[in-house]
Amino acid sequence: QDQKLIIKVFNNTNKPKIINNVHWININQINHSDKPHYLIAMSDANLFKKLSCKNNFLWSHSIQSVEKFIRKKQLLPFIKYKPIMILEGDYPYKSRNFFTSFYGKKILKIAVDDDFLNFNIDLNNIPKPNAIFTTKSDRNIKFLLDSWHEIKKKSLNAKLFINPPFNLSEKNIKDDINLRKKGDKNLLIQDLIKSRLFITPGHKTEVFCLAAEEAKELCLPIVTMGYGCLYERVNHGVTGFIAKNMREFIDYSLSILNDDNLYLELKKNLIKIKNLRNYENVKNDLINILDIKND
């Protein structure tokens, strides 16, 4: 007999609420008599202690070594509750240590918000030669700034916008490196569509890089070294470029900043793949991973 699917999320919400048929409950108000069919813990295997469930899944947002897993006191609950790992892409899947994914692992690619998916892109608009970096400022920022110093020499009108907090040096300011104003999602969208290039080396700790996916959804070409998951965000030569070294990183960036035709070609390719994945797709993929019968 079919039963209605009930979804409960336990977090730090101040008061219980129901949004789109999802129950939001403070984690300290868990009813321990609840017997869920499926239990998903976010990043911490110790959370499985809070409820009894036979079908456990551990959703990880990081690359964890065995040493870190032990240090965070996750090994014993991991062995006890036997969760299947949920990982957000090819890079974390391949990088996950066998001993921290012993009970299986599945890939669940996430998506960007509808505001990015539904934003209308003007194919013929050519922005000023602005580059933007909207991920955390500690992720290979020295590589980026050293590269930008060389880029600036051959693209005199180019500007680079990075996320705060970061202390700009006099050299950075001379290189037209600017701090973005942190604001809401609409401000981020405006900053991205006013840019011609999303530039990021990537970092070994990045397992999805939502910032790059948001830029791609707004049809912004990407230049990256492909570190971490960044190689998954770019189709080389079609939606951007994956450099093998700093020289290529600089040259690829210059080619997009200085060549209107190349920029428009990449943008045209990006528009073809716009709005291909949304949270309806994520939901369906999660249902398949959990093996829920959704008749």
Set out the residue ranges of the language-model regions:
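Extended catalytic core of nucleotide-activated donor transferases of GT-like folds
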Residues: 11-82, 91
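A short, active-site helix/loop in glycosyltransferases that binds the activated sugar's phosphate group
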Residues: 67-69, 81-105, 117
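Short beta-strand->alpha-helix junction loop in the catalytic core
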Residues: 91-92, 107-118, 166-168
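Conserved catalytic-core segment of nucleotide-activated headgroup transferases in glycan assembly
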Residues: 114, 123-185
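Short alpha-helical segment that forms part of, or immediately flanks, the ligand-binding pocket
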Residues: 189, 212-217, 231-232
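Acidic donor-binding loop of glycosyltransferase active sites
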Residues: 193-207, 220
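Short acidic/histidine- and often glycine-rich active-site loop of Leloir-type glycosyltransferases
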Residues: 227-237, 241-242
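A charged, aromatic-enriched C-terminal amphipathic alpha-helix characteristic of glycosyltransferases
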Residues: 244, 261-291
